[in-house]
Amino acid sequence: TKLKLTEDEFYEKMEMLIRWYETKCFEGKIRYYGIAFEFMVEEPFENKWHIEIERIKNIARKVSGEKNHFKYILFEYHIMCDWADTVKSQMIDGVKMTMIEACKALELETVASMPFAMGDGFKKYALSDMLDFVSKKMNHVIVGSKNPKHIEEILRCWRGNLSECSGRQRFSGTDLVEI
């Protein structure tokens, strides 16, 4: 968290980290990198979590120009936690935006974590409904489950065997699912 740092100290440390990642990209060890937000989407205005992604993108531009390798923003997003699409917590060029809108404006790809609300979503929603919800707004979705039956169902649904899914709707729009 930023709790023990001033704003300037935090962004100075981010610049050091971005320089390190850009070096690894230049060396061919990685192609792209990003940042993951733990509670920022749930508590978007809490100073200890809040990060201006435009400022991070500007640091990447300062370090490596427009062809920098800062590409991904990962955050919690699911049918029971839609704040990334409903709360205008980011400022881009003086305009208030949601996290998802800001990522799009900065040409950053969004990665949804916890699309099943840590399993709580299964108590209220069908798998296909939860996948459909996240895939409409996100570029990528990281899925997983401790339950082998859920993993099997996820794979069947994602491959298009909708008759085997527990839900009614078809999900679409997401380029990648990583399991």
Where are these regions (language model features)?
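Beta/alpha (TIM)-barrel catalytic core signal, keyed to glycine-rich beta->alpha loops juxtaposed to Asp/Glu
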Residues: 1-179
